[in-house]
C-alpha cells in the first residue's frame, strides 16, 4: 500500500509509539502519558494553560529562548501552531508578530523561558527560569 508521507508517519511511527506508551503504562491518565511522551514541553504548556484564563493573549518566546544552553525543551514548543494545540482558546503572539498582528496590543501575559522574557514585564519581579506572568501586576492580598 502506498501512502502519502504524512500518513506513513502517522500509521507507522506516531500510532505505534503512542500504543507502546499506553501498553507500558495502562493506568496513567492523559497528563501522565503526555508527560512521558513530550517531557518538559508538555509540563510547560500544561502549567501555562493552568495559570492563564482562556481569553489570555500570551507573548510567546522565540525559538532561541526555548533552545538556549542546556534547555529542557525541544524546538517544537516554539512553534506557534504546536503550542496552540495545547493552549487554545488562548492566543499567542510571537516576536515575529510585532508590527503585524493586532493582538500585540492585547497581550495579557508573558511566557518566561530559560530566564528570558522579563524585559516585557512592566514591573519588578523576582527572577525565575520558567513560568508565566501577567502584564498587570497582581495586587497583594
Locate each region found by the language model.
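Membrane-proximal, lumen/periplasm-facing interface regions of secretory-pathway glyco-
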Residues: 3-44
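Generic hydrophobic, helix-prone segments enriched in Leu/Val/Ile
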Residues: 6-18, 77, 81-89, 93, ...
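Aromatic/acidic, Gly/Pro-rich catalytic loop(s) in extracytoplasmic/lumenal soluble domains
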Residues: 6-8, 98-141
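Extracytoplasmic
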Residues: 38-39, 48-50, 54-106, 124-125
Amino acid at each position: 500500500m502506498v501512502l502519502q508521507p504524512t500518513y506513513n508517519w502517522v500509521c507507522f511511527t506516531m500510532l505505534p509509539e503512542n500504543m507502546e506508551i499506553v501498553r507500558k503504562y495502562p493506568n496513567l491518565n492523559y497528563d501522565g502519558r503526555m508527560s512521558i511522551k513530550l517531557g518538559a514541553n508538555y509540563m510547560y504548556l500544561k502549567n501555562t494553560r493552568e495559570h492563564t484564563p482562556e481569553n489570555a493573549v500570551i507573548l510567546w518566546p522565540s525559538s532561541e529562548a526555548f533552545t538556549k544552553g542546556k534547555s529542557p525543551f525541544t524546538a517544537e514548543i516554539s512553534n506557534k501552531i504546536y503550542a496552540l494545540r495545547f493552549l487554545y482558546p488562548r492566543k499567542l503572539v510571537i516576536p515575529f508578530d510585532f508590527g503585524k498582528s493586532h493582538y500585540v496590543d492585547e497581550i495579557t501575559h508573558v511566557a518566561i523561558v530559560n530566564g528570558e522574557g522579563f524585559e516585557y514585564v512592566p514591573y519588578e519581579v523576582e527572577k525565575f527560569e520558567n513560568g508565566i506572568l501577567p502584564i498587570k501586576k497582581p495586587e497583594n492580598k
